Amino acid sequence: MSTSRRIRRRGDALVVAFTALFCLGIGDAKGGPSISWPTQSWHQGTPASVGLDEKTLASLDADFVAGKYGLVDSFQVFRCGEEVFDRKYPHDYAGIYGKEAKSRGPLNARLTGPYNYFDPASHPYYLGTDLHSMQSVSKTVTSAIFGIAVMRGDFKATLNTPVLKYFDVAKVKNVDHRKRRMTLKDVLTMTTGLAWNEDVPYDDPRSDSSLMEATDDWVQYVIDKPMATDPGTTFNYSSGATELLAYIFQKETGQDIEAYGEEHLFAPLGIKHHWKRTYLGVVDTEGGLYLTGADLAKIGYLYLHDGMWDGRRIVSKEWVKQSLTPFVDTGWQGLKYGFKWWLYPRKDGRRFVWMGIGFGGQRLMVFPEEQLIATFTGWDILKDPAIDAELANRLLPAVVVARCQGDAHK
């Protein structure tokens, strides 16, 4: 299956259409409301108070309510430190996926536990809370935690460090000169060179991601894969690559990546979370994080401010810059990839919309020039919702004041 099929499986048709409005360009209105910090909670505002057109957002909301774009659970918009649009769309997932929840398959290789994706106890919300599965947006957050450890000196290895440094090579299969050259940077940019098939849907028995999740030892499954290309040369989306980071983080720092993230990222930003673990207790950094849409937006807000949060340095400006650098072309519709961030090119080809994207309809979208953040959650895990190309034109008038006061991205 092509890269485009894989991205569509994550609900990115909606992402691309929504970002298209900003690829068309925004007017030159000056000034705007000042920014604030949402550590305890987002200040509540209105679209008009931050220079957005409410009718444009309400039109999209109406289509979500009507089911035009599939099983969307939430749609939230943030600007200038305020939450200005918040809509939830309840669904009876126990009824929708009841049959699938009882039949073993690639998305529920184990009928009980957190890796039955049809089980309403843990999907899409965690145990009746408002914490929603982030799926592969977890990768974007993992990258942030990794960068924090680098900045603080707790992760001392350079990005050119070979991945096999952290393994007993005698116990790793398919070792060759290419696998020996695979580096941490290759893992961060999805250019490991490993033979990995995530081009098929996750309910396809050939999916390496689903096959990995059916095993006890995810890390061993990944590192044992043969090489297909030279590392650092070819983008190949691999959830397994990000799972390696949880293992490598513990080996390098001696600390659990979730506990480290709680202390140095989640607590300072006021983020509550749940994080699934593999059957061997390794943090599921490839897709196991649960957040609210409002707390997910804080990650975008942190990156909008170059890693600063209310006067405190959380992650280095250099890591933010590297994370949002287009290191590799994904091979689909101009999308580039940084350190676990998807980068969608704007009209001028030099600037990007920053995105975290997850299976089922999870997405974090950041528009730096406009200081605008949008989050979406959903649980459309069996079908690929379509979207009208005209959606971009419907949303273009939403930004009527170009920037917030105090905008670092003028």
Region spans (language model):
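Bacterial N-terminal signal peptides that target proteins for export
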Residues: 2-16
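N-terminal leader/targeting segments and the immediately adjacent pre-domain N-terminus
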Residues: 19-126, 150-156, 216, 394-410
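Active-site SXXK
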Residues: 53, 58, 81, 112-113, ...
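Short, charged, amphipathic alpha-helices and their helix-cap/turn boundaries
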Residues: 87, 97-122, 160-164, 203-230, ...
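Active-site helix/loop module of the DD-peptidase/beta-lactamase fold
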Residues: 122-124, 128, 151-194, 224-226, ...
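Active-site-proximal alpha-helical segments within enzyme catalytic domains
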Residues: 143, 241-248, 287-308, 362-378
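Active-site Gly/Thr loop motif
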Residues: 272-273, 320-375
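Structured C-terminal helix/loop/strand segments within mature extracytoplasmic catalytic/sensor domains
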Residues: 356-410
